[in-house]
């Protein structure tokens, strides 16, 4: 069952209006999508944060908009760069019977053999794009890295058929790689080369 969040329609106006909203403990937001025109709303910052911590950002929420329930997912969250606060939220209204294309976080599990041997784990991409019905939307996609050795990598092609949802990302989309550590000798050589170039 979706978590219900109460929201209120708001007037679009000056920056001072948005500042006043935030000072009052609310977050300016907008809802758009399935059978709904773009509608400016506000939501309790406390309730939004609590729901995200409990359910995860990739959950389906039910917004109570003036007595009307609207199923949504969080499309975008704008964070304040100086404080750990949410500045604005975009909600996407959805049809529960139709598949969505969304980005889902990658969750690495297991201890890599390569890391145990001194290798360095590199994760160039933190999310995967998937196609899934809202009710089946996962909080994350688990990727087992325990067998990875130094010099080895893992791409979408190697996990595509092990994942319960359809992955849209290309086969060569890199998930994780284990690189060899830089030795003290290599660092000295690199430093001396840089000095010669100077």
From Swiss-Prot:
Cited InterPro entries: Rbsml_bL25/Gln-tRNA_synth_N, Ribosomal_bL25/Gln-tRNA_synth, Ribosomal_bL25_b-dom, Ribosomal_bL25_C, Ribosomal_bL25_long, Ribosomal_L25_dom, Ribosomal_uL5_bac-type
Cell division listed as a keyword: no
Q: Does the keyword Ribosomal protein apply?
A: yes
Any single GO molecular-function term of the entry would be: structural constituent of ribosome
**What keywords appear on the UniProt entry?**
Ribonucleoprotein, Ribosomal protein, RNA-binding, rRNA-binding
Q: Name one GO biological process term.
A: translation
Q: Gene3D superfamilies under this entry?
A: Ribosomal protein L25, beta domain (2.170.120.20), Ribosomal Protein L25, Chain P (2.40.240.10)
Name the family the entry cites. Belongs to the bacterial ribosomal protein bL25 family. CTC subfamily.
This chain's function reads:
This is one of the proteins that binds to the 5S RNA in the ribosome where it forms part of the central protuberance.
What does the annotation say about its assembly with partners?
Answer: Part of the 50S ribosomal subunit; part of the 5S rRNA/L5/L18/L25 subcomplex. Contacts the 5S rRNA. Binds to the 5S rRNA independently of L5 and L18.
Name this protein carries in UniProt: Large ribosomal subunit protein bL25
From which organism does this entry originate?
A: Lysinibacillus sphaericus (strain C3-41)
